[in-house]
């Protein structure tokens, strides 16, 4: 018997190299959707992405999650064109996570008076309807004419609209450069998932929330009020509901225009409106607010950063019968004006520096708007005695 095992195996014709190559897709259109989407996500330049989507309708459809993740409308007809596209692709709205809408009122005015406008004079409804279709929207930035204010405000009333919203910026342009009525968008403060809110050039009177409208606790962490005319009682009302507001900034021009009607005269009124248990950073860059008495801030148990003017902190009443009550863990004190223009304030600040370990032991950084050679002598001497260095900026 032969020592070798012989097994007869039927021979198959070898597959030609040409046949193997033919099995491999030669075009992008031959790739599966999942792989196409991976390729599209790797495109770094927007123009490359757009060019790729012009290759075919399939490419355009596959790229929807990337194309519509973040969009911007800078002309009125853009959002109307997008609104029409939702008729054939209703799920497209749910792909959007960030939207920025910014166009001048003059453009909207011209567009609304076009004879063949698809919405006649009712541009507000399709606009708000388009935004409401974005069920996964997280970031909303609005800078549009005041005529759209009420329509957009309705988005914050519904329990299901914008359910994932995390940050929002609202600015409605008035023809006379005036303040828009925040009451029309007041429900934005009741949004349960909103964490960061910026309001620009708005006015709010003492009404705040009506009794039936008041929300439950919200997640608002950061609030910026830019060039606003806000009543202090209304501010107190709308800040009752954020469970853990961490940061607030209130800024205004040196000479507000139009003149203020609702804002208080004294900085104390705004300070009293703020939540004491949670806030960590306060910025009040509002030159026209006066300081009646020295601020008492000891109850602000979490406050670490304070940006303010010296006359607002130490007060302008004379004689000054009370000293500043600094927060227990305040670390950064930033003066937004040149300190020491008032001699009495300069002496009070010098006393604070000399006795920092007693009256403000947690302060590790004090920033002033002065130049280094522009400090009052009494403050220079106090810094030298206590070996404390100011920062200039």
Give residue spans per PLM region.
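CRL adaptor-proximal regions
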Residues: 1-30, 38-42
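Leucine-rich solenoid repeat modules
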Residues: 5, 39, 288-393
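Hydrophobic regular-secondary-structure patch
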Residues: 25-121, 149-151
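Conserved beta-strand elements of beta-rich interaction domains across eukaryotes
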Residues: 59, 78, 104-106, 147, ...
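Conserved beta-strand positions
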Residues: 73, 101, 142, 170, ...
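Leucine-rich repeat
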Residues: 79, 83, 108-277, 288-295
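Alpha-helical scaffolding within the catalytic cores
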Residues: 81-87, 267, 315-323
